[in-house]
Every structure is written in C-alpha cells, then in structure tokens.
C-alpha cells in the first residue's frame, strides 16, 4: 500500500524549512550613532542651561542654585552638578544684594524707652503767709462711676491694647455674641483658631481675619494670606512672657512644639532653632530633632556651638535680654551679659526697622519668623506650605513686609520647612507640611509665650 502524504512531501517540508524568514541583524554602528546624538543633545541642553544669559533660564538657574545651597544636605545638587564659576557667580550676586546683612548696619542698636516714666516735679515751696497754719484739707472724693462709664473705660482699654482690631467689626461681633462680654472687656477670650475652625467675623485694621483674642494673656491671632499661601500671625503683647524652652531630650531627641509649650506653661509657641537632620545610622532626613544646629541660650543656660558660616551666608544670633528686647547680632560677637535667651539661624529680616531684602531665600517654602514691634510686642509668624491647606509657602521677603506692616523693628527667620508650626491654647493652629505629622516634627527647642494668668498663679 502506498504511503499517503496528507500535508505534502518530505521534500516540500524540507524546502519550506530552508526558506524560513531570516532575522535582521542589529547594526551596532547605528545604535551607537543614536546614543551619541542623544548624549550630544543633552550636553548641548546642559551647556545652554548653565551658560545662557537668557533672562528666563538665568532666573530659574539662580533659583535652583539658591535652593540647593540653602539646604543642609542637598548643596551637592549645585556644587557637584554645576561648574564652580557658575555657582560662585550666583553667590557673588547674592552677596551684593545682601551685603547689608554682613555689616554693622545689620546689628540691633535700639533701646527701650519707657514713656510712662515719672516726670521730675519741682519741690514744694512753703508759702510765707501760711507757714504757721496747720490745716488738713481733704481732697474731694470723686463720684463713683456708673456701670456704663466703667464699661466704656474697659472698652477703651481693650482697643488701646489690641490696637490692630477694627472697632466696627469688633462691636458687631459683640452684638451678635453678647456672651463674649459675660465677664467684661478685660476678660474676653475668643478662640476660633483651630484647624477645623473658620475664624471670626472680626477683622484687623489691615483687613486680616481675627482668629483669637485672649485679653487675660494679651494674645491676638490673625489669619494672613497672599498669592498661593496662608498662615497665622500671632501677637504677644507682653514680651516678658517670652522665653526659649528646650526639649527635655536636647542632645538626644526632640519634642513637638506642643509638648514643649504644655510642659513649660505656655499659651503660645512656635518653631525656633534648626537641628542636624540625621539619625543614629547616619541617614539624612530621618533626624529626631534632638541635635541642635548652632548655639542657643535658654533661661540663662547656654547650649551648642556657634555656626560662623553656613551655605555661604553667616548665621545671625537673636538675643532676648533682661530688658525684654530682641537684639540681632553677628554670631562672632560676644554673647551679651544681659542675654537670657538666644538662638542662631539665618537670615536677619528686619534690623532697627530696616527691611533687609534678600535674593537668597526666595523659594516658596513653609516659613517661620519671629520679631518685635515698635510697641515691644512679640510677633510670631508661621506660613504653611508644600500644599498644606492649599498653601505652597512664600519667601522671607514677603514675610518681612508683612511683619513691617505691623510695626516690626527686629525680625529673624527661624527653621522652616517641615519644622514650621505654631501652637496656641492646646492645639496646633497651622498645619505641618508633612500631613502624616499632625503635631509636627520633634524640635530641639521652641519659642514659648507663657500664660500671664498661670504665671501670676504660681508667684
């Protein structure tokens, strides 16, 4: 029986196998040429970005270099990736713009003037015509004030202390909320500053929303806003209530702003010194806030070492002295004998009423600043950033102008970024830029404004 071939002969199969489609061999020269073109394009783009004088590119190149150099652990992004002469040119330009920060003009020279001092009186001269008379004349006792007159006096005293509060909006709020005056003008305590609160209908004379008014402790909180940012400006009317307070684990671990404030009798607190952001294993970015960056003094006790240079800019020292005044001095100046509390950071923002404009700190970041006004009031400013509540942050120049509007005479930048936070009366009133840290990062210390009522109770 003959063999049946269903799908063709063996010969046909062999023929087909011999004619299979050949795979194209790769041409190494063509691949190499493509890679060379890519590399040349990237190199050309790099040199254009680095050396062009185009204003748009030059602006963002300077911003990139400034951002890198202003960090504590990412300076290599500028120094290693860009030519030294390009980086130095930006540094030199910053030095020209900010040269006032390294001169005597950038150190505080003000002093406190007590306008309530008694005026010397001329001695009494006896009347020759009556020197033998012994007449006791009792002055007439003043008429007792009516309840309305007492209320008017208390109201006037309120607006004298809280001069920033718009009278019409305050009166309207009191009319809508008469319970506010249950204990009189001298005991008003309004608090709508919490993260879940919407604030009050009261405004400042500058149009800012009032978040809190605490008359017994003489504290005012204002909502401040701008293009793409928002924050809180707190005003402490009694500078004697301010001090720099440490974490109990300073040198080992930090505490949150709230923990430091609650432990030390504070009613208001904010970020102060920076810290070395490194853990025990040497990993940057994982620090616990315990290792202080620079020098500080807390209640007369000194800690840390002076940072003379950092990021090509000099640190400044903010000293709070026995006369309850802030003084901004160079870090290489001796610590004043009258200093009770101090910390070091950069830059100085306002010195003796002069705003120090800088091209160095122009990135949109969370900010923390502290200052003192011409009325000697303590000004605490914290700006949220990096998307917290839709706020992307701002630069120190904007912060300086805002503080200047409130009569600021001395102001310095504090540690910002994720560390920037403000706490008031038992709760945070600004959001940390890291949404996972509801109470903020651990800090080496914090500026704490003590409760006047609690201080009086312990004396």
Name every feature range the model reports, one short phrase each.
Residues 2-459:
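Gly/Ser/Thr/Pro-rich low-complexity, intrinsically disordered segments
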